[in-house]
Protein backbone atom coordinates (compact mmCIF):
# COMPACT_ATOMS: atom_id res chain seq x y z
CA UNK A 1 0.00 0.00 0.00
CA UNK A 2 1.33 3.42 -0.97
CA UNK A 3 0.27 6.86 0.16
CA UNK A 4 0.77 9.97 -1.96
CA UNK A 5 0.24 13.44 -0.53
CA UNK A 6 -1.61 15.57 -3.09
CA UNK A 7 -3.83 13.57 -5.40
CA UNK A 8 -2.35 15.12 -8.53
CA UNK A 9 1.17 14.02 -7.68
CA UNK A 10 2.79 10.79 -8.88
CA UNK A 11 6.25 11.21 -7.44
CA UNK A 12 6.30 7.61 -6.21
CA UNK A 13 7.89 4.94 -8.28
CA UNK A 14 10.20 7.52 -9.84
CA UNK A 15 13.95 7.09 -9.68
CA UNK A 16 16.21 9.38 -11.63
CA UNK A 17 19.83 8.28 -11.67
CA UNK A 18 22.45 10.61 -13.10
CA UNK A 19 26.09 9.99 -13.80
CA UNK A 20 26.66 13.69 -13.17
CA UNK A 21 25.30 15.70 -10.25
CA UNK A 22 23.63 18.38 -12.38
CA UNK A 23 20.05 19.66 -12.56
CA UNK A 24 17.85 17.90 -15.13
CA UNK A 25 15.75 20.65 -16.65
CA UNK A 26 14.96 18.48 -19.66
CA UNK A 27 14.85 14.71 -19.88
CA UNK A 28 12.77 11.68 -20.73
CA UNK A 29 8.99 11.76 -20.27
CA UNK A 30 6.93 8.56 -20.01
CA UNK A 31 3.65 9.83 -18.53
CA UNK A 32 2.14 8.06 -15.52
CA UNK A 33 4.71 6.09 -13.57
CA UNK A 34 2.27 3.28 -12.78
CA UNK A 35 0.54 1.68 -15.75
CA UNK A 36 -1.57 -1.44 -16.11
CA UNK A 37 -2.19 -4.19 -18.62
CA UNK A 38 -5.95 -4.84 -18.46
CA UNK A 39 -7.24 -8.34 -17.87
CA UNK A 40 -8.87 -8.60 -21.29
CA UNK A 41 -5.78 -7.67 -23.36
CA UNK A 42 -2.32 -9.13 -23.86
CA UNK A 43 -0.34 -5.99 -24.67
CA UNK A 44 -0.02 -2.38 -23.57
CA UNK A 45 1.89 0.58 -25.03
CA UNK A 46 4.00 3.21 -23.28
CA UNK A 47 4.84 6.50 -24.99
CA UNK A 48 8.34 7.90 -24.60
CA UNK A 49 9.04 11.58 -25.32
CA UNK A 50 12.49 13.11 -25.84
CA UNK A 51 12.30 16.51 -24.14
CA UNK A 52 15.98 17.25 -24.69
CA UNK A 53 17.49 19.59 -27.27
CA UNK A 54 19.44 16.80 -28.94
CA UNK A 55 18.95 13.16 -29.94
CA UNK A 56 18.76 10.35 -27.38
CA UNK A 57 18.65 6.55 -27.40
CA UNK A 58 16.13 4.76 -25.17
CA UNK A 59 16.45 1.24 -23.81
CA UNK A 60 14.44 -0.84 -21.35
CA UNK A 61 15.25 -3.22 -18.49
CA UNK A 62 12.53 -5.31 -16.80
CA UNK A 63 12.52 -7.01 -13.39
CA UNK A 64 9.72 -9.05 -11.86
CA UNK A 65 8.94 -7.87 -8.32
CA UNK A 66 6.92 -9.47 -5.56
CA UNK A 67 5.25 -6.18 -4.60
CA UNK A 68 6.11 -2.51 -5.25
CA UNK A 69 7.87 -0.73 -2.42
CA UNK A 70 11.18 -0.01 -0.73
CA UNK A 71 11.65 -3.65 0.33
CA UNK A 72 10.58 -5.22 -2.94
CA UNK A 73 12.26 -8.41 -4.11
CA UNK A 74 13.46 -8.26 -7.72
CA UNK A 75 13.89 -11.35 -9.88
CA UNK A 76 14.41 -12.10 -13.53
CA UNK A 77 11.10 -12.65 -15.35
CA UNK A 78 10.41 -16.15 -16.62
CA UNK A 79 11.64 -16.44 -20.21
CA UNK A 80 8.94 -15.33 -22.61
CA UNK A 81 6.55 -14.15 -19.88
CA UNK A 82 6.82 -10.43 -20.64
CA UNK A 83 8.29 -9.28 -23.95
CA UNK A 84 8.70 -5.80 -25.39
CA UNK A 85 9.44 -4.18 -28.74
CA UNK A 86 11.41 -2.53 -30.16
CA UNK A 87 14.69 -3.31 -28.43
CA UNK A 88 15.59 0.38 -28.43
CA UNK A 89 14.39 3.72 -29.79
CA UNK A 90 16.42 6.55 -31.31
CA UNK A 91 14.55 9.84 -30.98
CA UNK A 92 15.48 13.29 -32.18
CA UNK A 93 14.72 16.33 -30.01
CA UNK A 94 10.97 16.63 -29.45
CA UNK A 95 10.13 13.28 -31.02
CA UNK A 96 8.08 10.53 -29.38
CA UNK A 97 7.43 6.85 -30.00
CA UNK A 98 5.93 3.81 -28.26
CA UNK A 99 7.35 0.75 -26.59
CA UNK A 100 4.92 -2.18 -26.60
CA UNK A 101 4.77 -4.81 -23.87
CA UNK A 102 3.37 -8.31 -24.53
CA UNK A 103 2.27 -10.63 -21.73
CA UNK A 104 2.48 -14.41 -22.31
CA UNK A 105 2.42 -15.56 -18.69
CA UNK A 106 -0.10 -17.57 -16.65
CA UNK A 107 -3.78 -16.77 -17.17
CA UNK A 108 -4.82 -17.13 -13.56
CA UNK A 109 -6.27 -15.01 -10.75
CA UNK A 110 -2.97 -13.55 -9.48
CA UNK A 111 -1.81 -9.99 -10.09
CA UNK A 112 1.80 -9.55 -11.23
CA UNK A 113 4.16 -6.60 -10.91
CA UNK A 114 7.16 -5.58 -12.99
CA UNK A 115 9.61 -2.74 -12.56
CA UNK A 116 10.28 -1.25 -15.98
CA UNK A 117 13.35 0.99 -16.15
CA UNK A 118 13.61 3.41 -19.07
CA UNK A 119 17.21 4.34 -19.78
CA UNK A 120 17.95 7.55 -21.71
CA UNK A 121 21.43 7.62 -23.28
CA UNK A 122 23.03 10.57 -25.13
CA UNK A 123 24.13 9.86 -28.69
CA UNK A 124 27.33 11.85 -28.16
CA UNK A 125 29.72 12.19 -25.27
CA UNK A 126 30.26 15.86 -24.47
CA UNK A 127 32.62 16.59 -21.60
CA UNK A 128 33.90 19.55 -19.63
CA UNK A 129 36.78 20.10 -17.23
CA UNK A 130 35.92 19.47 -13.58
CA UNK A 131 37.31 21.56 -10.67
CA UNK A 132 39.69 18.70 -9.88
CA UNK A 133 41.13 18.72 -13.38
CA UNK A 134 39.36 15.67 -14.77
CA UNK A 135 36.67 15.45 -17.42
CA UNK A 136 32.99 14.82 -16.70
CA UNK A 137 30.05 14.26 -19.03
CA UNK A 138 27.74 17.25 -19.56
CA UNK A 139 24.90 15.05 -20.86
CA UNK A 140 24.04 12.50 -18.16
CA UNK A 141 22.48 9.09 -18.56
CA UNK A 142 19.01 9.14 -16.99
CA UNK A 143 17.09 6.12 -15.68
CA UNK A 144 13.39 6.45 -14.88
CA UNK A 145 11.68 3.62 -13.00
CA UNK A 146 8.03 2.76 -13.58
CA UNK A 147 5.72 -0.03 -12.44
CA UNK A 148 3.79 -2.21 -14.88
CA UNK A 149 0.89 -4.06 -13.27
CA UNK A 150 -0.45 -7.07 -15.15
CA UNK A 151 -3.98 -7.45 -13.87
CA UNK A 152 -5.15 -11.03 -13.29
CA UNK A 153 -6.57 -12.73 -16.37
CA UNK A 154 -9.37 -13.84 -14.03
CA UNK A 155 -9.89 -10.44 -12.46
CA UNK A 156 -12.08 -9.67 -9.45
CA UNK A 157 -12.47 -5.96 -8.71
CA UNK A 158 -14.03 -5.81 -5.23
CA UNK A 159 -13.91 -3.30 -2.41
CA UNK A 160 -15.71 -2.26 0.75
CA UNK A 161 -16.21 1.12 2.44
CA UNK A 162 -17.22 1.56 6.08
CA UNK A 163 -17.88 5.23 6.78
CA UNK A 164 -18.44 4.61 10.49
CA UNK A 165 -14.90 3.33 10.97
CA UNK A 166 -13.37 5.35 8.11
CA UNK A 167 -12.11 2.24 6.34
CA UNK A 168 -11.66 1.27 2.69
CA UNK A 169 -10.58 -2.30 1.92
CA UNK A 170 -9.42 -3.97 -1.28
CA UNK A 171 -11.23 -7.31 -1.10
CA UNK A 172 -10.56 -8.29 -4.71
CA UNK A 173 -7.46 -9.51 -6.53
CA UNK A 174 -6.35 -6.37 -8.37
CA UNK A 175 -5.12 -2.90 -7.42
CA UNK A 176 -6.96 0.42 -7.46
CA UNK A 177 -6.32 3.98 -6.34
CA UNK A 178 -8.22 5.71 -3.53
CA UNK A 179 -8.54 9.50 -3.61
CA UNK A 180 -9.40 11.19 -0.31
CA UNK A 181 -10.26 14.90 -0.32
CA UNK A 182 -11.40 16.25 3.07
CA UNK A 183 -14.40 18.56 2.76
CA UNK A 184 -16.40 19.33 -0.36
CA UNK A 185 -14.37 22.40 -1.35
CA UNK A 186 -10.82 21.20 -0.71
CA UNK A 187 -8.15 21.60 -3.39
CA UNK A 188 -6.24 18.83 -5.14
CA UNK A 189 -3.14 19.61 -3.06
CA UNK A 190 -5.10 19.04 0.17
CA UNK A 191 -6.03 15.51 -0.82
CA UNK A 192 -4.28 12.17 -0.50
CA UNK A 193 -3.93 9.29 -2.95
CA UNK A 194 -3.56 5.73 -1.77
CA UNK A 195 -2.61 2.78 -3.96
CA UNK A 196 -4.30 -0.36 -2.61
CA UNK A 197 -3.08 -3.79 -3.62
CA UNK A 198 -5.19 -6.91 -2.95
CA UNK A 199 -5.75 -7.25 0.79
CA UNK A 200 -4.74 -3.67 1.63
CA UNK A 201 -6.84 -1.65 4.09
CA UNK A 202 -6.83 2.13 4.64
CA UNK A 203 -8.05 3.66 7.92
CA UNK A 204 -8.39 7.45 7.78
CA UNK A 205 -10.50 9.82 9.92
CA UNK A 206 -11.22 11.90 6.77
CA UNK A 207 -13.25 8.97 5.43
CA UNK A 208 -15.72 9.43 8.30
CA UNK A 209 -16.31 13.07 7.34
CA UNK A 210 -17.98 14.67 4.31
CA UNK A 211 -15.63 14.87 1.36
CA UNK A 212 -14.93 13.90 -2.24
CA UNK A 213 -13.78 10.30 -2.02
CA UNK A 214 -13.24 8.20 -5.13
CA UNK A 215 -11.80 4.95 -6.33
CA UNK A 216 -9.94 4.98 -9.64
CA UNK A 217 -9.99 1.69 -11.53
CA UNK A 218 -9.04 1.30 -15.20
CA UNK A 219 -9.12 5.12 -15.56
CA UNK A 220 -12.72 5.26 -14.32
CA UNK A 221 -13.88 7.19 -11.25
CA UNK A 222 -16.15 5.49 -8.71
CA UNK A 223 -17.65 7.77 -6.07
CA UNK A 224 -17.84 5.96 -2.73
CA UNK A 225 -19.72 8.59 -0.71
CA UNK A 226 -22.70 10.84 -1.42
CA UNK A 227 -21.81 13.66 0.95
CA UNK A 228 -20.67 16.04 -1.85
CA UNK A 229 -21.86 16.77 -5.41
CA UNK A 230 -20.11 14.56 -7.97
CA UNK A 231 -17.07 16.33 -9.45
CA UNK A 232 -14.31 13.83 -10.40
CA UNK A 233 -10.75 15.06 -9.81
CA UNK A 234 -7.75 14.35 -12.00
CA UNK A 235 -6.52 10.73 -12.10
CA UNK A 236 -2.83 11.72 -12.26
UniProtKB/Swiss-Prot annotation:
Keywords: Chaperone, Fimbrium biogenesis, Signal
Signal peptide stretch: 1-27
Family: Belongs to the EcpB/EcpE family.
Its biological purpose: Part of the ecpRABCDE operon, which encodes the E.coli common pilus (ECP). ECP is found in both commensal and pathogenic strains and plays a dual role in early-stage biofilm development and host cell recognition.
InterPro entries registered for this protein in UniProt: Ig-like_fold, PapD-like_sf
Protein name: Probable fimbrial chaperone EcpE
Gene assigned in the entry: ecpE
UniProt keyword Nucleotidyltransferase present: no
Gene3D superfamilies: Immunoglobulins (2.60.40.10)
Induction section of the entry: Negatively regulated by H-NS. Positively regulated by IHF and EcpR.
Lineage of the organism: Bacteria, Pseudomonadati, Pseudomonadota, Gammaproteobacteria, Enterobacterales
Keyword Chaperone in record: yes
Amino acid sequence: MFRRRGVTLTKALLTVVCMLAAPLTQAISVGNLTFSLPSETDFVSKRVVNNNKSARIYRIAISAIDSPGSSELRTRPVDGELLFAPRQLALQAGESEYFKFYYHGPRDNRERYYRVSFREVPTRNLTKRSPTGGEVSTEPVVVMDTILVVRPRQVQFKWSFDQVTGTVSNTGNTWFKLLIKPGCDSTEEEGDAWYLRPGDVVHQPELRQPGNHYLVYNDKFIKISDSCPAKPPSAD
